[in-house]
Structure formats: structure tokens, C-alpha cells
Amino acid sequence: MKIYLVGGAVRDALLGLPVKDKDWVVVGATPQEMLDAGYQQVGRDFPVFLHPQTHEEYALARTERKSGSGYTGFTCYAAPDVTLEADLQRRDLTINALARDDDGQIIDPWHGRRDLEARLLRHVSPAFGEDPLRVLRVARFAARYAHLSFRIADDTLALMREMTAAGELEHLTPERVWKETENALTTRNPQVYFQVLRDCGALRVLFPEIDALFGVPAPAKWHPEIDTGVHTLMTLSMAAMLSPQLDVRFATLCHDLGKGLTPKNLWPRHHGHGPAGVKLVEQLCQRLRVPNDLRDLAKLVAEFHDLIHTFPILQPKTIVKLFDAIDAWRKPQRVEQIALTSEADVRGRTGFEASDYPQGRWLREAWQVAQAVPTKEVVEAGFKGIAIREELTKRRIAAVACWKEKRCPKPAN
């Protein structure tokens, strides 16, 4: 029995990055030998075991053979005669087909170290094309390592295009698509994930609402980048710089979906695109089974982001109604989230990346003022039932009006 550290832990160590999870491959062992050594079996489809002390995963070396459609249609063979090299050959990318033995020696039969140095994401073998999930995984790796200047090898990208054109991605379950997307959205450059999907044709298949934005023009005065799809990826990049929060990034990605519905004869203007996009956000989230909290914020951002941009001319009554509409009294975090997504929208434009966004500050300040109006005083004044809410709203509007007069400059005529 020989044990090797494999995959991401070896890759990230060679890149000088923190190693989070360790996966191990065991060569020359049977399931019974693993159980006798105190390991706990957890794998159903193939033998995977948990170490009795570290609880890290130890998998018996195995090979895989395509036996059906999609990413689950594989027959696995795990036995003591499976070599380390055979196990590494079934992996997706050469940089993931690396192993390290007890002496610290790197086993690299597929030239993963060479591709690490060249900053290349390259598939190990033609078997890559048998698993459609790998299209998304490569896109996610491209996003994860974009700051290190990694790129996808030309032949790998060509294979991803072939897989997409062959309809392989249609076999992916919504849960797997969302899981890969969720992980990509938390990387330093999530926009790269969606750009790669577009480059290989997968964006049109998996995210048609986003793909539809490319080629849709916006007024050059406000959007020097012109293309709404380009703007969407720029705003996502900006959101990633402004916040690590998944919900902020996802809502930013979806903020302009309504522009994909604008009739061509009305281009480049998109009046009412915010509210129009709400149903597309709902459609996308329902299809991919996006968590409800992310969906709800994305719908609010789609509906109200343009309103935030006009904050200096908003009436105090409108501002308080906005807080009602986003349910800020029960979910105060939404004020900050919407401020950040609106800022990402404005700064996610060519030439505006370093712009100040005072509307975000004013939104936060107005919220603090409205929130500070005490409910207790309204109750003590004798108001009852629905009259409490009505009086509280009046006082909040008055407080915001007083603040706005002092702190929020009126736009020049």
C-alpha cells in the first residue's frame, strides 16, 4: 500500500498558495484493508474513506469508463492493480494530475508542472470530453487563477466548444450548474467565468438571459463601453472589488437583465428595464434553483438600481417608500447591499472605474436617519393599530426631509 497527496493541494503548494483541503490516493489496497486500518468508508459509487484522525479523504486508485450520458454516466474500477499514473490520467487538467509521495517527490506523468509554469489550463486527455461538468470547472479555474495570468489552452477551449455544440451541457443538473457558478462568483475575478462560458458557447445554453445582453447597445454618453453584456461583466468585476458577498455579486450580475427585452427599434434606450428584468431574474433563479435570499436581493436590485442613481432628486416620501419596498426594517443589511450593487453599476463602465458614488453614502445616511425614529414615542403618544405605522411613516419622512435639506445637495438646474 502506498499513499500519495494528489490534486489541488499539490497544485496550490507549487503555486505558493495556501493549501485548504488535502485529498489522498491509496495505491495497492483493498476496501477491507482500509477498514481494518480504521478508515471509515463514505463513498457509494467508488471507495472513498475518511482518515480516523484527520478526517481527510483517502480514495482508492481508480479508473473510469464512460457508460452513459452526462457527468454521472461513468463506471469506476478500483482495485489494487490500478496504478497511480492510471488514476491521474482520469483527471480533468494537467495541473490537477499531480501527486506527491511521502518523500516529497512530485509525480507528474502529464506535465502539469510545465503547464503551471506556463500558466496554462490544459486537459489531460480526450476523456475530458466525456464529462460536461468539466466545461464549468475549467471556466471556474480560469476565474480562480486569472490574477496569476492563467489562460485556457487553445486545444482545450476548442474541445469545450465541441462539447457545448454536441449538447453535452444539457445533461447537467441545475444543482451542479449552480454549485460551480456559486464557487466561481466567490473568486477574485468572477467575470472571467462568464466570459469563458461565452467563449465556448455555454453561456447561451446555461445563462440565456445573460447571453442575450451581448450586442445590446446602451447610450454612449452613459455607457462608453456601449455593449450591455460587456457592461454586465464590468459591473461584476467591480462588485468583486467592492464586496466578498455572494449575494451582492449575484445581484450585480443580474441587475440589467431587463435590457435584453428592449425592442430593437427602441435601442439604445431602455426605459423601464429595471422592473422588466425582475421576471427574468425570477426565471433564471427558478431554473437553476438559486437560494431564495439571493433571488430576492437580485430582484430588488434589478427593480430599484436606477432609482438609487437619482437619489438627489428623490422626495423624502419616495426614499421612505423605498425602505418599505426592500423590507429594510426587518432586513437592514439590504441597504448596504443595494448601495454596493448600485455603486458597482456606475463604476462598472469604461472610464468610470475610479468614480465617486455619493448616492451610496446618501442612501446609507438616509437609512440611519429613518431607522433612528423611535417607535416607542409613537405608541406612547396614543396611536393604535394601523395608525402606529402611518404616524411612524410620517415621522420618518419628516426626519429624512430635514436630513436631506442639510446633507444631500440638490442637483444644479
Swiss-Prot record:
The terms under GO molecular function for this entry are: ATP binding; CCA tRNA nucleotidyltransferase activity; cyclic-nucleotide phosphodiesterase activity; magnesium ion binding; phosphatase activity; tRNA binding
Q: Which cofactor does it need?
A: Mg(2+); Ni(2+)
EC number of the protein: 2.7.7.72, 3.1.3.-, 3.1.4.-
Q: Which residues bind Mg(2+)?
A: D21, D23
Looking up PROSITE patterns in the UniProt record yields: HD
Q: Which reaction does it catalyse?
A: a tRNA precursor + 2 CTP + ATP = a tRNA with a 3' CCA end + 3 diphosphate; a tRNA with a 3' CCA end + 2 CTP + ATP = a tRNA with a 3' CCACCA end + 3 diphosphate
The protein's matches in InterPro entries, at most eight in alphabetical order, are given as: CCA_bact, HD/PDEase_dom, HD_domain, NT_sf, PolA_pol_head_dom, PolyA_RNA-bd, tRNA_CCA-adding_enzyme
What biological process terms from GO does the record include?
Answer: RNA repair; tRNA 3'-terminal CCA addition
Role summary: Catalyzes the addition and repair of the essential 3'-terminal CCA sequence in tRNAs without using a nucleic acid template. Adds these three nucleotides in the order of C, C, and A to the tRNA nucleotide-73, using CTP and ATP as substrates and producing inorganic pyrophosphate. tRNA 3'-terminal CCA addition is required both for tRNA processing and repair. Also involved in tRNA surveillance by mediating tandem CCA addition to generate a CCACCA at the 3' terminus of unstable tRNAs. While stable tRNAs receive only 3'-terminal CCA, unstable tRNAs are marked with CCACCA and rapidly degraded.
Q: How does it assemble?
A: Monomer. Can also form homodimers and oligomers.
The name under which this protein is listed is Multifunctional CCA protein
The root-end lineage is: Bacteria, Pseudomonadati, Pseudomonadota, Gammaproteobacteria, Enterobacterales
